[in-house]
């Protein structure tokens, strides 16, 4: 699945940031080769379709959102990479983690050994980390370029974007953003360097 209009946005991103389509394709190909033969996309559908979902980012408001998450444990939690550490440190379990593997790798590996679905994104700058998918029990692959084999393109550029696009693609009844701050402050769980 590729969202309508994504290709033109992707070309703009390549141009604006100086990224390489060739490297994105190589990383996608590598990810595809490491994914399990049977990809259970229906597991994601069962968690999202016609249900409210929390999309959780690593913004500065995340610590204040934890009480809401603890109060509503049964609502599906789609967690952006950087927020994973905060979620598991507070005794919560992500249902889905969307990651390009630049967050806290210890937290990602720990979560990846559970039933959490790890949605791993391949791009030109993370090919050296793609092998981590072998440690994940339930893994789905995504790309920002043309999908191939078992690797999909649901849209989005950041982990947080991809969480929202994933929820939308699987027809969530309602998408509730937590820890997704649109200001200039970076949360303590976000990566330090910004592209």
Q: What residue ranges belong to the model's regions?
A:
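Short, basic, glycine/proline-bearing loop/turn elements
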Residues: 49-55, 69-70, 145-152
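A short secondary-structure junction signal
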Residues: 65-68, 109, 129-132, 151-153, ...
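Acidic/Gly/His-enriched mid-domain segments of enzyme catalytic cores or analogous surface patches
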Residues: 73-76, 82-173
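N-terminal donor/sugar-recognition subdomains of glycan-related enzymes
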Residues: 1-53, 63-65, 186-195
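Short N-terminal helix-initiation segments at or just after the protein's N-terminus
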Residues: 18-23, 60-61, 116-123
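A generic local structural motif
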Residues: 39-43, 62-67, 104-106, 162-164
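Glycine-rich anion-binding loop/nest that anchors nucleotide
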Residues: 55-60, 159, 174-188
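Glycine-rich N-terminal segment of FAD-binding domains in flavoprotein oxidoreductases
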Residues: 56-61, 65-69, 76-88
């Amino acid at each position: 699945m590729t969202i309508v209009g994504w290709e033109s946005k992707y070309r703009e991103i390549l141009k604006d940031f100086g990224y390489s389509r060739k490297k994105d394709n190589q990383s996608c190909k590598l990810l595809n080769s490491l994914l399990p033969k049977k990809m259970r996309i229906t597991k994601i559908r069962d968690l999202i379709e016609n249900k409210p979902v929390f999309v959780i980012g690593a913004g500065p408001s995340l610590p204040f959102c934890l009480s809401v998450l603890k109060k509503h444990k049964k609502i599906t939690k789609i967690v952006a990479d950087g927020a994973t550490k905060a979620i598991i440190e507070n005794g919560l379990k992500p249902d889905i983690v969307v990651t390009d593997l630049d967050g806290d790798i210890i937290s990602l590996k720990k979560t990846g050994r559970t039933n959490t679905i790890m949605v791993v994104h391949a791009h030109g700058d993370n090919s050296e980390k793609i092998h981590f998918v072998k440690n994940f029990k339930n893994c789905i692959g995504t790309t920002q370029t043309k999908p191939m084999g078992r690797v999909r393109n649901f849209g989005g550029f950041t982990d947080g974007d991809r969480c929202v696009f994933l929820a939308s693609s699987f027809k969530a009844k309602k998408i509730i953003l937590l820890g997704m701050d649109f200001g200039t402050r970076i949360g303590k769980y976000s990566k330090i360097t910004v592209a």
